[in-house]
Amino acid sequence: MPAAGFRLSSRALFVDNAFGGVKIFRMKFEKIDPKSVAENSAKLIGSDWMLVCAGDRGGFNMMTASWGAFGFMWNMPAFFVFVRPSRYTYEFMESRDFFTVNILPESRRDALNICGSRSGRDCDKAAAAGLTPEFTENGVYFAEARLVFECRKAYSQMMEAGSFADKTLVEKWYAASDFHKMYVGVVERALAAK
């Protein structure tokens, strides 16, 4: 008979019983004021990366992103995320009023790599990345995240070549004219892992 044991991930305690079953005790989140996040947002997004997710129980997709911003707009905390129309996540961003920004711990960099290199059109990215979706009234976030921001879409606009003051950016990043769409999401709820 196998011995019982346990292991701890960044978001859950897994208890293996003597009969081969596994019980999962999820760690909880606490609601926080988004203005209390003291981390450098340039590092949080540009180096640590974020997982942008939109959808619901009926279907969702997420993508790894390292371009964006977390700041203050219209007197409210807000995220600025950029999604190309060619991305599967774009369909969900367009058809939903909310999206989430998930910040995973460094120990889950593998999940970010998977979500940034595979398409949800071709596979179940959450399963492939070992991520556990949690559903709210407005969308989806992941149990493995250390920070979650649930954002209500307030503004969106396609980027255009003519709007760039620095034309070298168009040459460098948009030679194929595959411009991003910018979404400004007002943070309606922020959660931190306990």
Protein language model features and the residues they cover:
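N-terminal amphipathic/basic-hydrophobic helices that include classical n-h-c signal peptides
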Residues: 1-26
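Basic, polyanion-binding surface patches
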Residues: 23-194
